[in-house]
């Protein structure tokens, strides 16, 4: 597994733990369709949340959440539609971004998490 894949998996696990601590239940990880992948699918009492996890080593190239481009948003929407067609739910769908920074060796330090609800 490459360095970015390892860091990405670590980031998704950190985001899942954060969401669980906020009262969400993780119902799916790395859901794939022909349009793309959704990192996490979580739910709370009211919402079924499609979560894009973003992390960066520094802010020199912008904030992590700024990398969720319009093209990426469209891929996430299409992938969420595939999920919803195959999973019956009465909950309102929502798209969130969980963003934070992580450098090599920082994986053991508590990092501030930004949870952007209804991001797009």
What is each PLM-predicted segment?
Residues 40-59, 76:
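Conserved catalytic cores of phosphodiester-cleaving nucleases, focusing on short active-site segments
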């Amino acid at each position: 597994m490459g360095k970015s894949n390892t860091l990405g998996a670590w980031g998704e696990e950190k985001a899942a733990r954060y969401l669980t601590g906020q009262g969400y239940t993780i119902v799916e990880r790395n859901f794939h369709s022909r349009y793309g992948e959704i990192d996490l699918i979580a739910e709370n009492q009211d919402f079924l949340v499609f979560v894009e996890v973003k992390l960066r080593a520094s802010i020199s190239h912008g904030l992590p959440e700024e990398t969720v481009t319009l093209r990426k948003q469209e891929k996430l929407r299409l992938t969420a539609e595939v999920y919803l067609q195959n999973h019956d739910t009465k909950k309102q769908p929502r798209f969130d971004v969980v963003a934070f920074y992580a450098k090599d060796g920082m994986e053991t330090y508590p990092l501030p998490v930004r949870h952007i609800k209804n991001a797009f």
